[in-house]
């Protein structure tokens, strides 16, 4: 499901947008404070961010700039500022679109659909076997060596169910004396680290057999 973050301090408008977007089958998070919104944007995976400019703690332009330093998540600015200077500044700071309040909800929904259509289809996760790192939407996830080896094995065998014994042999070694339940423990570790990016469900359990990434 498409993940959208709303950062808007006008609570009535924010709730209205959340209701409308949820009705359109988007999964929505909402923050009313600029710093809270920035923290959420940088720590979770989102397909699109709807961002007001005039916010408590930190303004929308600064949020946009900081997000662009780390990731390329599409951003739509919604604001009462209608001057050409403000529009140019918003786009130059990294926004993908700029809508002046008040606006028609149907126009916003159409712009969201248009931006999402333009986004390239990416693998939900990038497991780099050369650099030994894992990124989701440009954000690097810290993993232990064992966690990385386990995720890399599953990613390299995408759509192929890996038995617990196979995983144990590849990750821990054929002569390892650890029990197969250690695989379940490390799968749980991985899911917990992927959960903030809404990627924990990418590792599926095949009951009585093992695990697979679809």
From Swiss-Prot:
UniProt xrefs under PROSITE patterns: OMPR_PHOB (PS51755), RESPONSE_REGULATORY (PS50110)
Example of a GO biological process term: regulation of DNA-templated transcription
4-aspartylphosphate: residues carrying this PTM: 52
Modified how: Phosphorylated by ArlS.
CDD domains: trans_reg_C
Record keywords, A-Z: Activator, Cytoplasm, DNA-binding, Phosphoprotein, Repressor, Transcription, Transcription regulation, Two-component regulatory system, Virulence
GO molecular function, one term: transcription cis-regulatory region binding
Domain Response regulatory: 3-116
Localization in the cell: Cytoplasm
DNA-binding positions: 113-214
This protein's record includes keyword Ligase: no
Source organism, top-level taxon: Bacteria
GO annotations of cellular component type: cytosol; protein-DNA complex
Xref: InterPro entries: CheY-like_superfamily, OmpR/PhoB-type_DNA-bd, Sig_transdc_resp-reg_C-effctor, Sig_transdc_resp-reg_receiver, WalR-like, WH-like_DNA-bd_sf
One Pfam family named in its UniProt record: Trans_reg_C
Function: Member of the two-component regulatory system ArlS/ArlR involved in the regulation of adhesion, autolysis, multidrug resistance and virulence.
Protein name per the record: Response regulator ArlR
Species for this entry: Staphylococcus aureus (strain N315)
